[in-house]
Amino acid sequence: MSSCFKSSVSLFSVFLFMILKTVTSDPTYLYHICPNTTTYSRNSSYLTNLRTVLSSLSSPNAAYASLFDNAAAGEENDSNRVYGVFLCRGDVSAEICRDCVAFAANETLQRCPREKVAVIWYDECMVRYSNQSIVGQMRIRPGVFLTNKQNITENQVSRFNESLPALLIDVAVKAALSSRKFATEKANFTVFQTIYSLVQCTPDLTNQDCESCLRQVINYLPRCCDRSVGGRVIAPSCSFRYELYPFYNETIAAAPMAPPPSSTVTAPPLNIPSEKGKGKNLTVIVTAIAVPVSVCVLLLGAMCWLLARRRNNKLSAETEDLDEDGITSTETLQFQFSAIEAATNKFSESNKLGHGGFGEVYKGQLITGETVAIKRLSQGSTQGAEEFKNEVDVVAKLQHRNLAKLLGYCLDGEEKILVYEFVPNKSLDYFLFDNEKRRVLDWQRRYKIIEGIARGILYLHRDSRLTIIHRDLKASNILLDADMHPKISDFGMARIFGVDQTQANTKRIVGTYGYMSPEYAIHGKYSVKSDVYSFGVLVLELITGKKNSSFYEEDGLGDLVTYVWKLWVENSPLELVDEAMRGNFQTNEVIRCIHIALLCVQEDSSERPSMDDILVMMNSFTVTLPIPKRSGFLLRTMKDSRDPRSGGSASDHSATSKSLPLSVDDSSITIVYPR
């Protein structure tokens, strides 16, 4: 009997160890993002400071009990200073928090070995660091969508879509008002089903910022989790999750794991009489087997429940609509047409903002209260359909303060709709080419607009990992936010280059004459230097306050570039300056910007500077600028092809070197810096 009992206990111990090992294994990895916009080198001060920060966050002295802590290392105002935070899920213990943070601190250096900015998410915690201060700063980007594979049945969709947003908004308000910035809530969905929700912000946010952050991520609900029985959106500053099962640590979640009453596992009496004494032995044997087996069954049930939870998390991670670069794919951005109609009051005239590329633009309000700009493409336009798909594919991959943010899209029959962030100050041309409104644009603002556009283009060309050529940069495609910061928009013409690709050819010329580079307008060749040419024209328009097309056949001048060149060689560049800011600008900055613009519009694209070089020229007056060469491309030579006074698009026009007898060097495409 003793041997049997010991054997049973031994087996039970092994089984229990296996269960505990499963339960206490590594944290559940969700996702990580480390954009390569800024990197550090090996043995650099930044790496030393980063290791100090991660060591501090994962040290025994960190504030695991409060589930949130921050650290910094490096001198104040030093570019190598590092800031870091961790946030653990509000329902985990301090021990689980500690283990997760320690694991994440080690893992993030392996997943992001050179990037200065990174965030890594686990089911139990998040670790984030940056070269800029992040404490108290609300950020929803970069973010990740995670969805459950299973869908709600068709007859329940309408009710589910009503219940879920209301539940999440309620729990978001509850979390924002709590000191921990964490809350859970549940709501009855059907007689037999309950929706469980969890939301959380980093505790360093104000109540207002926390609620704003949660409302914004909840806004992604129709795009990330349409009809899904479970899903979540995780961002640097906040997150939400919902499921149709209790996934967080509350009494209702712990109940299935609780052991049954002790009487069910208590050994039966050992003194039952037996005629031959065998009954007693049999009872002992049964007891020796029954006790560990009963406990094992209970623990097996607990293990299955835990594994099911982990499996649900894993399924979510495996089915997320993200590409290998951590960029949200277009599959996660879709709106229902009914939601668009509701947001725009069925596309009422009072909501119309104006006309965009291939359609009209409306102001809309989503169910969470966020104001958006909704671009509705003209129905039946095959060209619009192509540009629509391209715009979604391109813009969904971009994240930069100087690019308009695509929030979603709708494709429903003939309806093709894009949903952008709402930018209150319309576009640059609305101010720049109006005699009264242009006075709002003093030189300081214009200079910041020039710099912002340059940074946005640099991101497209170099830092987005994709090398994107916009091909239609012009004043009407530069939006201005509430602080008059520029945001490049309208990516319907944009093209993505491969890693080693430096140029491309096309017979379908798209864009706007006057902003096109000669090699593109004549030969159909485009590269990053095509956008540099357009940028140069934009800079000249910002300085002069005049449209490029307004110079057509005026005093024998073909275009704005020719007019500027004439005054430049006459050593009278300040005559170009817009009268609206005369006497209120920095002379050296204006002259330098004119000089840079003339370098951008040179005929030979290989002699044009890169956007990287342009920003160096703008920010360092010690850099000597090369002497610009005259552009050989005049708008008046294209009169037979299309009257540039219309400012129209060339999207339906095909051009080759034979159709326009202008002299342009076929080999004038430069080689882009490899990345």
From Swiss-Prot:
Q: Where is carbohydrate linked to this protein?
A: N36, N43, N77, N106, N131, N151, N161, N188, N249, N281
The cross-references to PROSITE patterns, in alphabetical order and at most eight, read: GNK2, PROTEIN_KINASE_ATP, PROTEIN_KINASE_DOM, PROTEIN_KINASE_ST
Q: Which residues form the Protein kinase domain?
A: 347-622
Q: Which residues form the signal peptide?
A: 1-25
Native species? Arabidopsis thaliana
In this UniProt entry, the residues modified to Phosphotyrosine are: Y420, Y520
Q: In this protein, which residues make up the domain named Gnk2-homologous?
A: 28-134, 140-247
Q: Which family does it belong to?
A: Belongs to the protein kinase superfamily. Ser/Thr protein kinase family. CRK subfamily.
State a single Gene Ontology molecular function.
Answer: protein serine/threonine kinase activity
Report the subcellular localization. Answer: Membrane
Q: Which UniProt keywords apply?
A: ATP-binding, Glycoprotein, Kinase, Membrane, Nucleotide-binding, Phosphoprotein, Receptor, Repeat, Serine/threonine-protein kinase, Signal, Transferase, Transmembrane, Transmembrane helix
Transmembrane regions listed in the UniProt entry: 282-302
List of catalytic residues: D472
The name on file for this protein is Cysteine-rich receptor-like protein kinase 25
GO cellular component term, pick one: membrane
Which segments sit on the Extracellular face? 26-281
Phosphothreonine: modified positions: T512
User: Which E.C. number(s) belong to this protein?
Assistant: 2.7.11.-
Q: Which residues bind ATP?
A: L353, G354, H355, G356, G357, F358, G359, E360, V361, K375
What membrane topology is given?
A: Single-pass membrane protein
Q: From start to end residue, where is composition biased (Polar residues)?
A: 648-661
What CDD domains does its record include?
Gnk2-like (cd23509), STKc_IRAK (cd14066)
What this protein catalyses is: L-seryl-[protein] + ATP = O-phospho-L-seryl-[protein] + ADP + H(+); L-threonyl-[protein] + ATP = O-phospho-L-threonyl-[protein] + ADP + H(+)
Chain intervals for the UniProt region annotation (Disordered): 638-661
Q: Which residues lie on this side of the membrane: Cytoplasmic?
A: 303-675
